[in-house]
Amino acid sequence: PWFGTWGRDTFMALPGLTLTTGDMVTSLKVIDSMVSRMKHGLFPNTAIKGTPAFNSSDAPLWFIRALQQYEKYDPDFDIWKKYGKAIKEVLEAYRAGTSGIIRMLDNGLIYAEDVNYPLTWMDAVVDGQLVTPRPGLVVEVNALWYNAVCQALKWAEKRDRTFFKSWSHFPELIRQSFVDQFWNQEKGYLADFAHGEFKDFSVRPSQVIAVSVEYSPLDPEMKKSILDVVQGELLTPRGLRSLSPKNEAYKGIYEGNQEKRDRAYHQGTVWPWLLEHYAEGVLVVHKNAGLGQVRKIFDEFEDVMSQRGIGSISEIYDGNPPHVARGSISQATGVAALLRINEMIEGFN
């Protein structure tokens, strides 16, 4: 085992690992444990030499999504009563700015930049340099931000009028700003990040999160177009590629020494955890008509579960066929994704 406890991954994996198996008690225990470690609206993402590193721009937003998922399994549970204070602390921290690294702009979007640390899941570093720098406005961070604000307002509407009045005008501002910043009508998909006047339109997978979230800033046609692009360039039987093979920076094989592997980690390598959001997006857009594709995605993993980590799936796979298994023999987010996809299928059945 390696990596240890990761704040972002904890909240990403929690619904799949606990809620789909009916383990509501563990789900809340983990959430409570993480909330006890929250500082200035942020969660520790890792511990570097024993010191917590609060260097995740989205872990608090995944926290709110985890609560959102929990409520679906226990609709009588009073989320706002127990976690309203923590939720407000998160949103106010983003709004006011956290240590000058993460802050809300006048257009309602979240801007995050730190030259010393990666702030998103694409976090490989070689010789002190980020392999996949994503400074400024990041697509999944702002999709999760919109979802978090909308969900918080729903919880607070009849419980916390002061908070509701203070935040009620933000969803439309954020939604319009998101579309203005990230959507390209001609290309038919979203920018991965925007920094100043520059927008990175490399075809990357994080945009599917903007399709899958409960509250999405996108209209149905945008969602369908994004899924078409992702299916055409990123979808494999093992997950979504982290970069399109059409991009000159694409690396289709994850091999070599530590440096070579790190340079390929988010530059074409396939990640199974992203399938949760792709599958959810397919069912959101196509409903029953998409069930066959989602079932195929799930069934594709049956054979590989008897390889490497028995009864599990690998952390990553090569971007190039035959998509050789790489990385850890099992990782929480990938396993959680398959559990959630299985439940999506059963839900439609």
Task: Give the positions of each predicted feature.
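Solvent-exposed loop and edge beta-strand segments that line ligand/cofactor-binding
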Residues: 1-10, 48-60, 123, 127-143, ...
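Catalytic cores of carbohydrate-active enzymes
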Residues: 45, 95, 102-105, 146-254, ...
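Flexible, active-site-adjacent loop/turn segments at secondary-structure boundaries
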Residues: 1-4, 41, 54-55, 77-78, ...
